[in-house]
Amino acid sequence: MNGTDVAPEVLWKPSPERAARAAITDFTAFVAERTGRELPGYHALWEFSTQDLPGFWSAVADYFGVRWHGQPTEVLPAAVMPGADWFPGGTLNYAEHALATHERGAVEDPAVIAVAEDGTEQLLTLPQLRTQVGAAQLGLRRLGVGAGDRVVALVPNSVQALVGFLATASLGAVWSSCSPDFGAPSVIDRFTQISPTVLLAVDGYRYGGREFAVADTVRKIRRALPGLAGAVHIPALGTAAPDGMIGWDELTSEAAEPEFTPVPFSAPLWVLYSSGTTGLPKPIVQSVGGIVLEHLKSLRLHWDLGPGDRFLWFTTTGWMMWNFLIGGLLVGATIVLFDGSPGHPDLMTLWRLAQRHRVSLFGMSAPYVAACQKAGLRPSTELDLTAIGAIGSTGSPLSTSGFRWIHDEVGKDLQIASFSGGTDICTGIVGGAPTVPVWMGEISCRALGAKVESYSPTGESLLDEVGELVITAPMPSMPVFFWGDEDGSRLRDSYFADYPGVWRHGDWIRITSRGSCVIEGRSDATLNRGGVRMGTAEFYRVVESVPEVADSLVVDTSSSSGDGDLLLFVVFEDGADVEAVTKALRTLIRTELSPRHVPGVVIPVPAVPRTLNGKKSEVPVKRILGGAPVESAVSRDSLADPAGFDAFLQAAREALAAGSRG
């Protein structure tokens, strides 16, 4: 039975003029003429995109003028998961699309703006970028890199990272990167799985006004990769190349125009990694063609990004959003790379950057929005942010108060596009569209080509009810395989074990009768109290709306063997009256959520443990407090702060042993 849906406040609705000039409107007309279908609105287009997969994805390829070298024989012989074979026979090259001159602005317009934390800027036009990529391509060739070989990189969000990736892709080789703030064991766990040919590595990085040398990390990585044919030193801190490494300048010493090696549609483009909460991180391989099509579709149609636009997303090279940001080149936009701390010297840093470079699409994480909100920032009163047309938020669900803050303090005529997807598919499967309204606290729509549904435990499709987020039809950017997973069992176990032939994403979702969505948290971190299920995201929206709460984590220690307790861990703001705030939290949770969800224990902690990708470590904490050994519940190398995790567990155990009751 379906639940009820009461529409929340509409925060933004596109004007008729804005909707008319959106690329998605032109694409809809293109599809209507091509198919003879009537497509009166977004939902009709979405239905077409998920019901006629060959028709939709061939339309995407033709609309964007994909540069085929070998023509595909068909689009999708069989719509099966896993194992969908997209565009068999088709060959292409990612870098050729990223470096194309089609419809780009004036030749002197920057293709890339790279900004360091200290304000140093580097602007590259498309011809300049092509020249650098050509030089790096020649250098990689000299080191023996060819199609299918792996190039790995320990790099910040910099020009060298971009050039290294595009040069790798131009050769038909496979890219994989980690941020230099990763510890050596984390990097080694990732890179050793894919047996790279070449390593690119910086000597250090700058963050929060400080310099961090990583020479020792690089030495350990090189020792762990005995099959390297070459290692390249990038002097971010100005040091000389150590023995056995060549300098970046030497790699790129010979100028050349890049050449593009065509590879099959399903050939690997890059390897991304799961957070690796337990065991080794999953080495997720996405295809050249799948990413080209998906990012063209997402960035041009959903984000309305194109020539003349400037695209900034705060990210590191260890998060899939870096790969997504680079995709801005595919649609002719200028990409803005920021390397540093978003809080140095203060939280206005990125907003000043957005003003200076007239950013059109500004993306961030939901925790960054919360930090700006709690700091009382009012960016639109201090800066001219009128160039921004859309704000993107991902990483975790954007709270209702976060929506309100963006609307009130950044711009009332802004599309607020909270979106969710993940590393597994390197895109959003639910998000926004320039012709769809923004409702307070909700994700506006399901993405084109993403047949997202909400499933009951028995596989019944739900509406206006919370269920398991599943994808019931293949998408081109789904993994073609996990590296080293010879029989495909690890991939099948990761996504298809619960509903055969259906992708289980691992989140709770509610899809409304309007077509909007609400992500309710991870389905393996559900709060189940007296039979009433609740996602953790809903819990955090309430708890973290309290000004005295800096951060929080909630776990339900119940299991199949019996009821457990509901534990709320809180990082209180300095000077907070812990006893009074705890009492207020209990009252707020009782009235805003339910009496069943009032925590049995409220425990002050110094910090909430997070993964390297910034996600709260709910499941490992739940497992450990349920009795699992720490070493089997979490990979320490997956944690952003292993020592902080130890301090968190110590505080939790001491409070529980003392019978702490708030």
Put a short name on every predicted segment:
Residues 44-48, 95, 112-166, 183-188, ...:
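Conserved AMP-binding/adenylate-forming core of the ANL superfamily
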Residues 108-110, 231-233, 244-273, 280, ...:
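Conserved pre-ATP/AMP-binding loop-to-beta segment of ANL
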Residues 153, 178-203, 355, 362, ...:
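AMP-binding/adenylate-forming catalytic core of the ANL superfamily
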Residues 156, 198-217, 238, 316, ...:
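Adenylate-forming
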Residues 170-250, 357, 365-366:
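Structural core segment of the AMP-binding/adenylate-forming
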Residues 230, 553-559, 567-568, 586-662:
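Conserved C-terminal "lid"/linker of ANL adenylate-forming enzymes
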Residues 292-310, 320-360, 375-377:
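Conserved AMP-binding/adenylation subdomain of ANL enzymes
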Residues 301, 355, 389-516, 522-526, ...:
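Conserved AMP-binding/adenylate-forming
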